[in-house]
């Protein structure tokens, strides 16, 4: 049986909710994370530290990788669909966004990457990987305190030559 190798990549988009500034009346804008502390302290509102957010992103990363592999194994025949690991990278940004009514969020633009070895067609690989990734994204195990949204975009599958 001929096994083909496929490089699979996707963008992983995360929104972290940081809180609401009730007295903020200016236009929506981007702001450096370090400048937010002063705004939150002026309203006596809890504000998550960068370390807390980094730990939450580490948890999401680890659990997303685990859940993806678990769902992939559930959806496929292990002897026909081989995968060793999946890598998710979610770098914490230095900027946050304050919406019109004071809602403060941080957007994380991350990546997903893996290699699959299978006898399935490229279309079948796309369908299975997309489904496993969506199931993993919907998993309750990914929930962390400040996670507001999690999605993938630009799923790309390329065959790797010999």
Residue spans for each PLM region:
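Intrinsically disordered low-complexity regions specifically enriched for long asparagine
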Residues: 1-6, 116-133
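Short structural boundary motif marking the start of a folded domain
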Residues: 2-8, 98-108
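Beta-strand elements of well-folded, non-transmembrane domains
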Residues: 10-18, 108-120
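Periplasmic peptidoglycan-binding/tethering modules of Gram-negative envelope proteins
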Residues: 31
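Acidic, low-complexity intrinsically disordered segments
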Residues: 35-96, 111, 124-162
């Amino acid at each position: 049986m001929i096994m083909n190798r496929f490089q699979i990549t996707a963008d992983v988009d995360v929104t972290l909710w940081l809180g609401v500034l009730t007295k903020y009346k200016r236009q929506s804008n981007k702001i450096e994370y370090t400048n937010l502390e002063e705004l939150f302290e002026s309203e006596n509102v809890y504000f998550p530290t960068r370390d807390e957010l980094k730990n939450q992103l580490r948890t999401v990363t680890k659990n997303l990788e685990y859940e993806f592999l678990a769902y992939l194994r559930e959806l496929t025949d292990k002897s026909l669909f081989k995968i060793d690991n999946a890598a998710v990278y979610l770098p914490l940004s230095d900027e946050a966004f304050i919406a019109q009514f004071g809602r403060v969020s941080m957007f994380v633009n991350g990546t997903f990457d893996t290699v699959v070895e299978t006898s399935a067609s490229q279309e079948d690989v796309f369908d299975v990987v997309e489904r496993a990734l969506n199931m993993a994204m919907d998993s309750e195990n990914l929930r962390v305190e400040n996670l507001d949204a999690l999605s993938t975009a630009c799923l790309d599958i390329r065959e790797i030559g010999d």
